[in-house]
Amino acid sequence: MNSPSPPRAEPKLRDSCHACAASKLKCSKEKPSCARCLKRNKPCQYLVTRRAGRHHGSRSKKVPTISPASAPEPQPFSTTPPDGDFMIEDYFATPISLQFPDFVDTSNGSTTQDWSTHPALFDTTNTSPLFDTSTLNFFDAAESLSAPLQLPTSTIPFPEISHGLQGLPTEHHCGCLVQVLQLMKKLSPSTPVHCTAWPGQQLDKDSGSALLLQPIIAENQSILETVATVLACPCSEDGFLLSTICLVVLKVMSRYEAAARCASLSATNSRSEDALVEDNVAQFTATGSSVAVLIGSYKVEGEGFDRMRAHIVLSELHRVQGLMKGLSERLHVAGRNAKDDNILHASRMNVDSDAVTGAGASAGEDVPMGDATEAVLPFHASFFGQLEANLRRRLRRLSESTTDLVRRA
């Protein structure tokens, strides 16, 4: 009579459902449906767990066979130096108990010319003896002869390694960032905008002074032209370059305001630009002296000086306004790119916030949750919009203040 077969053990199910394990999320382990699958109204399925460890499959490694027709021919191995008559077979035929004096004696058939082709045997920098003075050690001698028995470099060509660098990507460096940084250095506070006196005059607040506006205006024109050239380059879509360009434009507008009010932007003074402007205006107003301005070859002085000075600066602001159009387009493009990057980053963080690590997730084991590494984005989505708003607000304030100077003069 056959005994009944033992009951078959029920297979062990995984602790995490298939949906949570595939998404690498922590499962609530509720059966028949976990909280996540129940919330998403998805089928919750617990698969049979598998034993941890490596699975030995029936895969066999295939060793590629090389047919004799496709096998490369071996290079001929030559142990003879190019210009010498010494053969390694002669060395092997030498008795082991060869004496050192007999080895170097010229009576054994070797001449000075034969050994001159092997200078490594008589290297004076090596202080240790090559051979024992009583008997010749075969292995020490073979090691000492390894240098002159090397293959000539002409028999085996050196492989070309330059082909490995052909696939590397190369970046196009147009030098726009360097130009903008040079402009920023040129406009640094260490080079203040001074009220330059008329040639032959002293800049004295008590006896009168003169303003040389032409160099400031010409320099600002050159800077704005350089910025316009950089904006025409495709590299101007870079956020870091755009940020530096905006700083340069702000500096140029500050120089226009300083020229209109005869302010001095000195790095030694930590006060704001508005305080400097007010002090300079009050200084020239309190003196009550006549001031002259040089515009090209024209000299304007007397009561019309303040009006002319502010009017000239006001007429130059159209250059900044024309530059703002191209700069705004670049800022809009950079803002859209930053917004897309933020959306993509947020979606990745939403998926990876509860991610689990380790091989135990696929085996149904409890694995501690790992900390998601948040990537640092260089710019916020609203950063470039704020830059554009600040530039337009600064230009509007400069235009209004300069217009007010013209009216009051």
Curated annotation (Swiss-Prot):
Residues 49-83 are annotated as: Disordered. Induction: The expression of the dibenzodioxocinones biosynthesis cluster is positively regulated by the transcription factor dibT. Residues 51-62 have a biased composition (Basic residues). The lineage of its organism: Eukaryota, Fungi, Dikarya, Ascomycota, Pezizomycotina. It is found in: Nucleus. GO terms for cellular component: nucleus. Disulfide bonds: none annotated. Transcriptional regulator; part of the gene cluster that mediates the biosynthesis of dibenzodioxocinones such as pestalotiollide B, a novel class of inhibitors against cholesterol ester transfer protein (CEPT). CDD domains: GAL4. Residues 17-44 bind DNA. InterPro entries: AflR, OAF3, Zn2-C6_fun-type_DNA-bd_sf, Zn2Cys6_DnaBD. The keyword Metal-binding applies. The keyword DNA-binding applies. GO terms for biological process: aflatoxin biosynthetic process. One of its GO terms (molecular function) is DNA-binding transcription factor activity, RNA polymerase II-specific. Keywords: DNA-binding, Metal-binding, Nucleus, Transcription, Transcription regulation. This is Transcriptional regulator GME11370. It holds the Pfam family Zn_clus.
